[in-house]
Amino acid sequence: MIYLDNAATTLIKPETVYSAVLNAMKCAANAGRGGYSEASAAMNMIYDTRCRAAELFGIDNPERIVFTQNATHSLNTAIKGVLKYGSHAVITSMEHNSVLRPVFSLARKKMITYSVAPADRYGCVAAESIVNELKPSTALIVVTHASNVCGTVNDIYDIRRKTDDIPLLIDASQSAGLVKIDMKRLKKTLLAFPGHKGLYGPQGTGGLYIPEDMEVSTLTEGGTGSVSESPMQPQFLPDRFESGTLNTPGIAGLGMGIKYVSENFDEISEHEKKLTAILIEGIKKLSGARLLGYDSTEGRVGVVSAVFFDRDCVELANALGESFGVAVRGGLHCSPLAHKTLGTTLSGALRFSAGAFNTEDEAEKAVYYLKKIAE
């Protein structure tokens, strides 16, 4: 199989990730629930992973990072924890349903209102587009760092500079581990990230960074192993947002995934640029194909999507898989607003997304097979 659906999840992980997961399943007890060695080892491992994530994202205090089930969980925690009755939110036209649906749910209940800042035809959201949607009641701005449909990267630093001190939530689902993120440059900004994509951790892992200058309500409450005598949820992080048993094996694997990315960041970036260039140039040569987003590797991550004249993108994806063993994704990619922006609501798109463990030969073969079935 040629696996080119890394934007959904990285299927192939570093061997250290598999080993860490297995070791934790065999040896790790419940962190914070006992003073014996296995529980202490689990607690130390979780803290080590927290520290690795903090270092990768330029975060001074690792305890401001809370572990979640995935980026969707992180985004819901942030959105529903920041927005109050009467609040106004600004999202962009490139957001995933993990943002749109919780915001829409709150609006449907008449709790909040929201506006959508439009992106340009390349899927890029300018800071000015967001500024134009701000109101006195705006309590949160939500921006995807990189599009899961066309790969376009938004300038989160310029957006932060031009939106004053309004709380900002960055969805790093497609950028974490692929684009350098420095939270020291982003005041009053939350960061939601998955563990199973560009960080090469297992599925069922994610995180949310909550800065000290922001107040976020809890989505869930429960046992934390701390302040057990009180019916009140602990107010200190990370315990405030980590109720119940954590995914200890998953977090162990995530720690090794982050270690791998941190130690090989530049090499991974250059490798994925080469693969992305092969996919872009190959698709541009196909008759009847329209590439989405920028037509070079600049200003984008390794998500390469296209539409084809008179061809159904889901059928093309299925044909690539069934006939040639090429795993890609066709359709709307859980991002209807993005497809509306790009003019692909009816057709959807065929998406290729390379990862660190793909080869140039695989990318070239994928383009060759696409040509055979699309032309």
Predicted features and spans:
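Pyridoxal 5′-phosphate
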Residues: 1-375
